[in-house]
Amino acid sequence: MRAKIPSEEVAVKLNEWYKLIRAFEADQAEALKQEIEYDLEDMEENQDLLLYFSLMEFRHRIMLDKLMPVKDSDTKPPFSDMLNEIESNQQKLTGLLEYYFYYFRGMYEFKQKNFILAIDHYKHAEEKLEYVEDEIEKAEFLFKVAEVYYHIKQTYFSMNYASQALDIYTKYELYGRRRVQCEFIIAGNLTDVYHHEKALTHLCSALEHARQLEEAYMIAAAYYNVGHCKYSLGDYKEAEGYFKTAAAIFEEHNFQQAVQAVFSLTHIYCKEGKYDKAVEAYDRGIKSAAEWEDDMYLTKFRLIHELYLGSGDLNVLTECFDLLESRQLLADAEDLLHDTAERFNQLEHYESAAFFYRRLMNIKKKLAEQRFQ
């Protein structure tokens, strides 16, 4: 029989495990997790530490899903079961553990594209940020908040949080990946307020740094973001090249982000009038979105297919926009409503164009209201 292991020793390992998770060191994190699970069998009783382990296990799963996404039904245990177990002990969480609960729950809701819910949890976590002493941990939180605000176009909130995070990451050489991701967010926000050239400067820097990291995911993401900026500048030919490169890398490594890249490629082919290529990309993208069970992109693919490759049925388009709005994906709806209205205007279907312009104004109003919540 093994001697009881002091909980302090296990706590040290839990902290090391979390550092590996934050750094996306999946293999090392998995090995240490197994070691900790073995230690827990003979650890002296400490309920707080067991709760800490449950929270870190949940965060570990989020990390793995980011690096190697799999369908939730294929995982053991499912996210929902892990959440239920943690929430059943929520009343026991105080201080730092309560911070982790809200922070990780926010990350989960962000993963599910429930952006408003994610922000709500992050706000609760921010109230507990005083319990966080580690500077990198604060930077991680700031980065995550910047990320979700970017997705709902709360530009200045996002820029503020991203800049604070970047200031911290710049002090630490090991956090090159996060520096690149902060550059992505800052550039995306600059694009949203039409400072495209400034955004491109950040993105070219991010692409160079991503190549130095030699990480396929980051390189593909950098190509995608440069493509998005070129698209915003109206340089469709160059954007097409960047999207093709991003899609190829994402697909080669079986990253879920391939769905997004192929959607952007399909969209740009449609706008360029390259309909044969658009059909090929659409078939590729809709298959990928179905395999990943990505309802948002299934809806977006259906929408642009109907708009550019189908008959432009108003009922189908309206149903697609209703679905996007019901998921609070207002920024996505805004961009596609603009294209839909412009498309009908070009086709001289002025009544339909006016209908979608009015809906676009409605979405802009909702986004503006969110900025003051």
From Swiss-Prot:
Keywords: Allosteric enzyme, Cytoplasm, Hydrolase, Protein phosphatase, Repeat, Sporulation, TPR repeat
InterPro entries assigned to the protein according to its UniProt record, in alphabetical order: Bac_ResReg_Asp_Phosphatase, TPR-like_helical_dom_sf, TPR_rpt
Alphabetical GO biological process terms: sporulation resulting in formation of a cellular spore
EC number in record: 3.1.3.-
Highest taxon above the source species: Bacteria
GO molecular function, one term: phosphoprotein phosphatase activity
TPR repeats: 99-135, 146-179, 220-253, 259-292, 334-367
UniProt entry tagged with the keyword Membrane: no
Keyword set includes Cytoplasm: yes
Residues at which L-glutamyl-L-arginyl-glycyl-L-methionyl-L-threonine binds: 147, 150, 181, 192, 217, 225, 228, 260, 297, 300, 335
Compartment(s) where it occurs, according to its Swiss-Prot or TrEMBL record: Cytoplasm
Uppermost EC category: hydrolase
Domain remarks in the Swiss-Prot or TrEMBL record: Contains a small N-terminal 3-helix bundle domain and a large C-terminal TPR domain, connected by a linker region.
Similarity section: Belongs to the Rap family.
Name the UniProt record assigns to this protein: Response regulator aspartate phosphatase J
Native source organism of the sequence: Bacillus subtilis (strain 168)
